[in-house]
Design a protein with these regions (language model features):
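An N-terminal, well-structured beta->alpha segment
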Residues: 2, 7-105
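Ferredoxin-reductase
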Residues: 9-13, 83-159
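Gly/Ser/Thr-enriched, mixed-charge loops and adjacent short helices
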Residues: 33-38, 42, 153-167
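Short helix/loop capping segments that flank catalytic or ligand/cofactor-binding pockets
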Residues: 52-54, 99-100, 150-152, 165-167
Length: 167
C-alpha cells in the first residue's frame, strides 16, 4: 500500500471534520508519522480492534469504527432477515470516545437494516454478554478501553472495539 496516496486520499475526503483535516495537515512534512498512520489498515487482534487515537487508517477513530462496523454488518446481513431481526446489542465504557464510537456503530448497523439495542449509559462488559443472551441478539459490540502494559507511552490507554459474533 502506498501510504502517501492513502494520506492524500484521506486529506481530500469530505467526511473529515475541520479538526481532523487540521490534524492531518499538521503532519504533512513528517513522512514517518504519515507512514505510521497510513501504511495499512488497523487489524483485529485477540482483543478486537485496538489502536492509538488519531486520524488515519492505522489508528482508532470514528472512520475506522464505521469501516469495521460495515464489515461486521455484512456478516450479520449474510445470515438473512432473521439475523438482522435478532440484531446487535452495543455497550460502551467511560473512556476515549466510547459513546461516540458506540453510536457510530449503531448508525452503521441500522443503515444496514439491523435491529440495534444500544445501552443508554455506560455498562460493564458482562452486562453486554447478558444482553446478547437475554435478547437473543445475533451479535454484540463492545466499545471499551483497556490499560496498556507498564512502560506504555504517555497516551496510556488504547480504545478497543470488539464485535462478537456467534451462530
Amino acid at each position: 500500500m502506498d501510504f502517501m496516496k492513502e494520506y492524500e486520499k484521506w486529506l481530500a475526503s469530505p467526511a473529515l471534520s475541520d479538526a481532523e483535516r487540521a490534524e492531518l495537515e499538521s503532519i504533512r512534512n513528517d513522512p514517518k508519522e504519515i507512514e505510521s498512520r497510513f501504511y495499512g489498515p488497523l487489524e483485529f487482534g485477540t482483543a478486537g480492534l485496538r489502536g492509538i487515537m488519531a486520524v488515519g487508517l492505522h489508528n482508532m477513530n470514528i472512520h475506522v469504527i464505521r469501516w469495521a462496523t460495515q464489515g461486521f454488518a455484512q456478516v450479520i446481513c449474510a445470515e438473512g432477515e432473521e439475523g438482522k431481526r435478532r440484531g446487535v446489542a452495543i455497550c460502551m465504557d467511560c473512556r476515549n470516545h466510547s459513546m461516540e464510537f458506540a453510536r457510530a456503530a449503531a448508525e452503521v448497523c441500522a443503515a444496514n437494516g439491523i435491529h440495534v439495542r444500544i445501552f443508554e449509559s455506560l455498562r460493564p462488559t458482562p452486562e453486554l454478554s447478558f444482553a446478547v443472551r437475554e435478547y437473543r441478539c445475533q451479535a454484540g459490540i463492545n466499545c471499551v478501553s483497556r490499560c496498556l502494559v507498564t512502560g506504555a507511552p504517555a497516551w496510556g490507554t488504547a480504545p478497543a472495539f470488539r464485535p462478537a459474533y456467534q451462530i
